[in-house]
Amino acid sequence: IALAAAADLTRTVNYVIDSGSLPMQVGDKGKLTIDVSGVIENVRVLSDQTGDIVFDISKTTFADYPAFNSITAAQRIQLTNTDKYFDDVLNNWTTNIVAGDILRFDVISVNQIRRVLISLKLKL
């Protein structure tokens, strides 16, 4: 039996920023080590409520830690008076991820939102 399509060689990296019952603050919200190599195909963001948030994703290698460089360039992720965001164009992003890279998530500004899910789809 022949397969009609090649296997889906993608992985989704999910990261949750949650401030609990308190207002979310700006700054470094944590780091995540990625264990696969691939290319980011899209980013999807869901928040707990309508509001505003701007954040950046940076990456580094284990050898270069703690120096990080933004992968979003001037195209930071931004929700404005909404609860969701999707981008599959990723203009000027650094989309290559190498196994062992470390991602950092920084909130630049926020209003109303207390919890946000960031999903990066990687093509392996």
Please place each PLM-identified region on the residue numbering.
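Glycine-rich, low-complexity segments
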Residues: I1-M24, D48, V54, S58, ...
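C-terminal interaction-tip segments
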Residues: V16-Q25, K29-K31, I108-L124
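Extracellular and analogous surface-interaction loops
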Residues: G27-V39, W93-T95
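A short beta-strand element within beta-rich, extracytoplasmic domains
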Residues: S37-Q49
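Short loop/turn segments at connectors of secondary-structure elements within structured domains
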Residues: V39, G51-V54, A99, Q112-R114
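Exposed aromatic-hydrophobic patches
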Residues: Y85-W93
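Noncatalytic modules at the cell exterior or secretory-pathway interfaces
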Residues: N92-S109
